[in-house]
């Protein structure tokens, strides 16, 4: 009986040891999403903004073809993954119920290597995201028609 209890405790403790990395991995995908796509209060939304943000966010080696920055409150973006600000959309995606202010940066020129030059398109759009554990982890670019 004591040996069985000891084995149970060992398995239980090992299970606890495995839980935090899983949660940390989920949060890291969300943090990566924010790094690539979130800028709460942009300073200008022109070509220079795109070139600066793409460089600062590490998206220019090689030059990323297209990237969208979402502006505003991150809680509203998170809410797309629930019923508060999101609806199901196609396969395993969610679409926002309300539009977001966004800046889409499109690569100009043919070279994928720096210096990267971008053209900015600013506007308001509903956004489509993939969610894991109620957090956005991927922005579906196909919804945007700059």
From Swiss-Prot:
Disulfide bonds: 50-105, 63-116, 81-131
Origin: domain of life: Eukaryota
Record-annotated active site: 37, 138
Motif (Nucleolar localization signal): 55-59
UniProt cross-references to Gene3D superfamilies, sorted A to Z: Ribonuclease A-like domain (3.10.130.10)
Keyword check for Coiled coil: no
EC code: 3.1.27.-
Keywords, sorted A to Z: Angiogenesis, Cytoplasm, Developmental protein, Differentiation, Disulfide bond, DNA-binding, Endonuclease, Hydrolase, Nuclease, Nucleus, Protein synthesis inhibitor, Pyrrolidone carboxylic acid, Secreted, Signal, Stress response
GO biological process: actin filament polymerization; angiogenesis; antibacterial humoral response; antimicrobial humoral immune response mediated by antimicrobial peptide; defense response to Gram-positive bacterium; hematopoietic stem cell proliferation; innate immune response; negative regulation of apoptotic process
Signal sequence, start to end: 1-24
Regulation: Has weak tRNA ribonuclease activity by itself due to partial autoinhibition by its C-terminus, which folds into a short alpha-helix that partially occludes the substrate-binding site. In absence of stress, the ribonuclease activity is inhibited by RNH1 in the cytoplasm. In response to stress, dissociates from RNH1 in the cytoplasm and associates with cytoplasmic ribosomes with vacant A-sites: ribosomes directly activate the tRNA ribonuclease activity of ANG by refolding the C-terminal alpha-helix. In response to stress, the angiogenic activity of ANG is inhibited by RNH1 in the nucleus.
GO cellular component: a single term: cytoplasm
Family: Belongs to the pancreatic ribonuclease family.
Oligomer and partners: Homodimer. Interacts with RNH1; inhibiting ANG ribonuclease activity. Interacts with PCNA.
Function per UniProt: Secreted ribonuclease that can either promote or restrict cell proliferation of target cells, depending on the context. Endocytosed in target cells via its receptor PLXNB2 and translocates to the cytoplasm or nucleus. Under stress conditions, localizes to the cytoplasm and promotes the assembly of stress granules (SGs): specifically cleaves a subset of tRNAs within anticodon loops to produce tRNA-derived stress-induced fragments (tiRNAs), resulting in translation repression and inhibition of cell proliferation. tiRNas also prevent formation of apoptosome, thereby promoting cell survival.
The protein's name in its UniProt record: Angiogenin
Lineage: Eukaryota, Metazoa, Chordata, Craniata, Vertebrata
């Amino acid at each position: 009986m004591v040996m069985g209890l000891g084995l149970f405790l060992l398995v239980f403790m090992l299970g606890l040891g495995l839980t935090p990395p899983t949660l940390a991995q989920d949060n890291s995908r969300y943090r990566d999403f924010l790094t690539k796509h979130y800028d709460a209060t942009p300073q200008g939304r022109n070509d220079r903004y795109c070139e600066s943000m793409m460089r600062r966010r590490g998206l220019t080696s090689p030059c990323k073809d297209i990237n969208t920055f979402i502006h505003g409150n991150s809680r509203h973006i998170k809410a797309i993954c629930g019923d508060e600000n999101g609806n199901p959309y196609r396969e395993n995606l969610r679409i926002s119920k309300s539009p977001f202010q966004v800046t889409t940066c499109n690569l100009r020129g043919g070279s994928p290597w720096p210096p990267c030059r971008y053209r900015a398109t600013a506007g308001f759009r509903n956004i489509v995201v993939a969610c894991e554990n109620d957090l956005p982890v991927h922005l579906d670019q196909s919804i945007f028609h700059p």
